[in-house]
């Protein structure tokens, strides 16, 4: 029996190659010479004669396209967010108001074990007074320190990371013979 394929055996047992018809290799579009030829062949195959065009119905297709595009169009509004406050925090006004609150609230107070409770009341009063200035989009941190005078030294330090253009802080101090009250107000602008 004879095998079919490229390599066929002869009756004597020797193999020989059967003649394979060689096809021409397709030109590659990456070769500069054959690229123009490929384009010409593709363009030749893509030309068609238009024999008949159906007339449009009552509603024109062009009108439908216009309606569809107008439905996609959205109104554009300007951005509503602000990058800066309407009214900048004015430290000198807040400082005078806090000084007045401390002076009025602490004129007859002696230092005792109720000082922590008094610190909370002062902080709430200062926060309410600062909010009356109506600084839009500002957040406030109020810290009131009640320190008894016993001949000691004290260092108070604060650190922060903020925007130096809009954020600020205020300190107010009220001092008597038996205690010192330090009120700190931090005003932070939130965009």
From Swiss-Prot:
Q: Where in the sequence does UniProt note compositional bias of the Polar residues kind?
A: 11-20
The protein depicted here goes by the name Dynein light chain Tctex-type protein 2
Q: What does this protein's UniProt record list under function?
A: May be an accessory component of axonemal dynein and cytoplasmic dynein 1. Candidate for involvement in male sterility.
Source species of the chain: Mus musculus (Mouse)
Family designation: Belongs to the dynein light chain Tctex-type family.
Region feature Disordered, mapped onto this chain? 1-29
Q: How does it sit in the membrane?
A: Peripheral membrane protein
What happens after mutating residue 64 to S? In T-haplotype; requires 2 nucleotide substitutions
- Tissue/organ expression: Expressed in testis (at protein level). Expressed at the pachyten stage of the first meiotic division and in later haploid spermatogenic stages.
Looking up Gene3D superfamilies in the UniProt record yields: Tctex-1
Keyword presence, Glycoprotein: no
Q: What is the effect of changing residue 17 to E?
A: In T-haplotype
The protein's location, in the record's own words, is: Cytoplasm, Cytoskeleton; Cytoplasmic granule; Membrane
Involvement in disorder:
Could be involved in transmission ratio distortion (trd) in mouse t-haplotype which causes male sterility.
User: What cellular-component terms does GO give this entry?
Assistant: cytoplasmic dynein complex; cytosol; membrane; microtubule; sperm flagellum
* Keyword line: Cytoplasm, Cytoskeleton, Disease variant, Dynein, Membrane, Microtubule, Motor protein, Transport
Q: What is the effect of changing residue 93 to S?
A: In T-haplotype
Q: Span of the secretion signal? A: none
Entry's InterPro entries? Tctex-1-like, Tctex-1-like_sf
How the protein assembles, per its UniProt entry?
Interacts with CCDC159. Interacts with CSNK2B.
Its chief place of residence is cytoplasm
UniProt xrefs under Pfam families:
Tctex-1
GO BP annotations, alphabetical order: microtubule-based movement
């Amino acid at each position: 029996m004879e095998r079919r394929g490229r390599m066929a055996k002869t009756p004597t047992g020797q193999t020989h190659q059967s003649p394979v018809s060689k096809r021409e290799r397709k030109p590659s579009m990456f070769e500069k010479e054959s690229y123009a030829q490929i384009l010409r062949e593709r363009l030749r195959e893509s030309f068609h004669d238009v024999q008949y065009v159906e007339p449009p119905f009552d509603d024109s297709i062009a009108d439908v396209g216009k309606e569809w595009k107008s439905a996609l169009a959205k109104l554009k509004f300007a951005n509503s967010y602000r990058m800066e406050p309407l009214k900048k925090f004015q430290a000198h006004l807040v400082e005078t108001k806090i000084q007045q609150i401390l002076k009025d609230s602490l004129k007859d107070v002696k230092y005792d074990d109720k000082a922590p409770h008094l610190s909370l009341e002062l902080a709430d009063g200062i926060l309410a007074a600062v909010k009356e200035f109506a600084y839009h989009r500002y957040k406030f941190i109020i810290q009131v320190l009640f320190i008894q005078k016993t001949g000691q030294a004290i260092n108070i330090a604060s650190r922060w990371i903020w925007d130096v253009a809009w954020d600020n802080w205020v300190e107010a101090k009220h001092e008597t013979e038996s205690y010192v009250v330090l009120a700190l107000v931090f005003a932070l602008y939130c965009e």
